[in-house]
A protein has these predicted regions:
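Ferredoxin-type iron-sulfur electron-transfer modules in oxidoreductases and energy-metabolism complexes
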Residues: 365-381, 389-391, 395-453
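N-terminal, Lys/Arg-enriched amphipathic/low-complexity engagement segments
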Residues: 1-58
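Acidic low-complexity segments
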Residues: 97-160, 171, 227
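Hydrophobic alpha-helical positions that pack around
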Residues: 215-326, 332-339, 347
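Short histidine-centered loop motifs in beta-beta connectors
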Residues: 55-64, 68
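Gly-rich Lys/Arg/Thr-decorated short loops/hinges at beta-loop-alpha junctions or inter-strand turns
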Residues: 177-191, 311
Length: 453
């Protein structure tokens, strides 16, 4: 694999149409170093944490497992294996409701006495040597097998199985690997802290991913309000040929459809994917996980979660085992403040309201945001005034109010005519709507109905 000459940290001055500039609120947790959560007494590892088929358990009650042991698998074309995130004894199978409302089975594990804790755990995941200049690249097949065995999924929120994304397609050759370090969702800083504190596994993982898809170019996109992170990545990438580029700080800059044109000049087709224009996109945390899976044979068992908002006492960035409860992470951040009014799985733009603090963290959980009463706009919904603000804000040039109102009326063919499935649910339209119409919720409802029709 021969990469293009590096351009260092450069700036892309173009921007995309639409989008918004909500208050970032990242200052709440941005300067908080990653902390390792003490091993909980119990984790519940969901058997569906990804796009695709549900895994079947491969362990039973009373089995002893070690951290990293396989506990669920599926032979379906689209799925991702799941692994024990702590060492201990398997308890009786239970179920949990995920933030998106789906009820899924879990593998509960009661913690044993022997666990890695604190700095030792952090170093096991992100520390040590991560070769870049003298990286002995495995074959593409070996990289894909390692990624599949490790159960890797996109950690930016989509949770699409990574081994499928990296699978070569002779009909669609890949020119560029884009590594997404934008983290444009307000409040969340997990990726920022990872880029700042552990940039080398990100660079190593990017080199491995590019080798798997035979990309000649690697570009890391970072919003221009994260200069320290970009500098850390640039230093780690020295002499590798990897470019680190600033893009405008604007929501939703981290969306593939917005990021790919900014970094490559190629527009992703309306009903297509980045690979249609020779691009594969991976999140920075996913890149680090690829390095760990391929070079160390370690599966995805932990992730960094930002616990933030004015509704928590001490916002933090926490390295936590998959399957720990949201409530335990909130307690690790000092608990809820007295004026906490709403808890979100994720951030305020694309997150889901959390109804149960016992909900387990999954591979795609990037943050927990606790909002106060002052954060919430208590304005009643009124009729659409046809102001067009939602249209101006939509980064995909859709007409959100028409889609949402068609869904509300059950006019499904009309909703499809207005391209309901093209909507990425970024929330720009709802943020701008002066009538407080729940545009995103209506569109989600419409998609759910059409998916089950």
């Amino acid at each position: 694999m021969s990469l293009a000459q590096p351009a260092g940290v450069t700036t892309t001055r173009r921007s995309f149409a639409g989008g918004i500039h909500p208050p970032s609120s990242k200052q709440l947790a941005r300067d908080q170093p990653i902390e390792v959560v003490p091993t909980p007494k119990l984790v519940r590892v969901p058997l569906l944490q990804h796009v695709g088929a549900l895994c079947e358990p491969v362990v039973k009650s009373r089995d002893e497992v070690l951290v990293g042991d396989l506990v669920g698998k599926s032979e379906a074309p689209v799925s991702a294996f799941v692994h024990a995130s702590i060492s201990g004894k398997v308890a009786k199978e239970s179920a949990a409701t995920l933030p998106n409302g789906r009820r899924v089975p879990t593998v509960p594990i009661k913690a044993g006495d022997e666990q890695l804790e604190g700095q030792e755990l952090f170093d096991d995941i992100y520390g040590g040597e991560w070769p870049t200049l003298r990286l002995d690249l495995p074959t593409a097949d070996l990289i894909l097998q390692s990624v599949r065995d490790a159960g890797l999924v996109g950690m930016g929120g989509a949770a699409f199985p990574t081994h499928i994304k990296l699978a070569l397609n002779p009909d669609r050759p890949i020119d560029t690997l884009v590594v997404n370090g934008c983290e444009c969702e307000p409040y969340l800083t997990a990726d920022y802290r990872l880029m700042l504190e552990a940039p080398r596994p990100i660079i190593t993982g990017a080199l491995l991913a590019a080798s798997a898809v035979d990309a000649r170019r690697i570009v890391i996109g970072v919003e221009d309000d994260k200069r320290q992170a970009a500098e850390a990545l640039s230093t780690a990438a020295e002499a590798t040929g990897i470019e680190v580029r600033f893009v405008k700080t604007k929501y939703p800059q981290g969306s593939e459809r917005q990021l790919v044109p900014m970094l490559t000049g190629n527009n992703v087709p309306a009903n297509g994917l980045p690979l249609d224009v020779g691009v594969v996109v991976v999140n920075v945390a996913t890149a680090a996980a690829i390095a760990r899976a391929v070079l160390r044979g370690k599966p995805m068992t932990h992730r960094i979660v930002t616990v933030t908002g004015r509704g928590v006492e001490t916002p933090k960035n926490l390295l936590a085992p998959i399957g720990i409860s949201y409530g335990e992470l909130i307690e690790a951040a000092g608990g809820l403040s007295s004026d906490a009014a709403r808890i979100l799985a994720g951030g305020p733009m694309m997150g889901f309201t959390l109804g149960d603090l016992d909900t387990p963290v999954t591979k795609g959980t990037s943050g927990i945001t606790a909002l106060t009463r002052d954060d919430l706009q208590q304005i009643e919904e009124t009729s659409c005034i046809r102001c067009g603000l939602c249209v101006d804000a939509c980064p995909l040039n859709l007409v959100p109010t028409r889609i949402a109102l068609a869904a509300r009326k059950g006019a499904w063919s009309l909703a499809e005519r207005y391209h309901i499935h093209a909507c990425m649910e970024c929330g720009c339209c709802a943020y701008q709507c002066p009538a407080q119409i729940p545009l995103v919720q209506l569109i989600r409802m419409g998609k759910a109905h059409l998916a089950g029709a």
